[in-house]
């Protein structure tokens, strides 16, 4: 695991000890940020299930203004902190120690990108997407929710406030993109 591009390019990131996370591969991370391109510059980024912090750190390295990392696992929190220090991005990263679902039940603050990559294949992505749909103020008007799951986990979601706009499959990883539903 490494930072692909930007100010921290080439830095190797620490992994969370154990098997409680499923970090994104460098190949998928590079593909994701090729899709996002320069749009990530000066944005607010939410890494909902932080894990190693690799996705939010990549966003910061490429110019995101600020990233919030949520994780309830103490080892993941320490890994994110170490990786922010390693990449010298600590001043633009914020670690929230706690449950992602409880966080989403709080007062919404808009993010341009919300990255949803739960650690296990237990429909947690559906729960997170449902909570976001109930409080659409979490996503900025021009923002995107990006879900990382195994392709076998995918199922169409009936959402009131968001619509699926794109899917990208990379071997055993599926990225699903959502945005605010357009008014008819």
Q: PLM features: residue spans?
A:
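Class I S-adenosyl-L-methionine-dependent methyltransferase catalytic core
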Residues: 1-184
């Amino acid at each position: 695991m490494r930072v692909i591009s930007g100010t921290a390019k080439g830095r190797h990131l620490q992994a969370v000890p154990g098997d409680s996370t499923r970090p994104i591969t460098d190949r998928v991370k590079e593909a994701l940020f090729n899709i996002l391109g320069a749009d990530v510059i000066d944005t607010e980024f939410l890494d909902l299930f932080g894990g190693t912090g690799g996705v939010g750190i990549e966003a910061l390295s490429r110019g995101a203004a600020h990233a919030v990392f949520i994780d309830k696992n103490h080892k993941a929190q320490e890994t994110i902190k170490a990786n922010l220090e390693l990449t010298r991005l600590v001043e633009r990263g914020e670690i929230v120690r706690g449950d992602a679902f409880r966080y989403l039940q709080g007062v919404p603050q808009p993010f341009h990108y919300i990255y949803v990559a739960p650690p296990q294949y237990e429909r947690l992505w559906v729960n997170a997407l449902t909570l976001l749909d109930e409080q659409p103020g979490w996503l900025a008007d021009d923002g995107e929710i990006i879900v990382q799951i195994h392709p076998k986990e995918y199922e169409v979601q009936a959402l009131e406030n968001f619509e699926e706009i794109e899917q990208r499959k990379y071997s055993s990883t599926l990225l699903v993109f959502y945005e605010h539903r357009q008014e008819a």
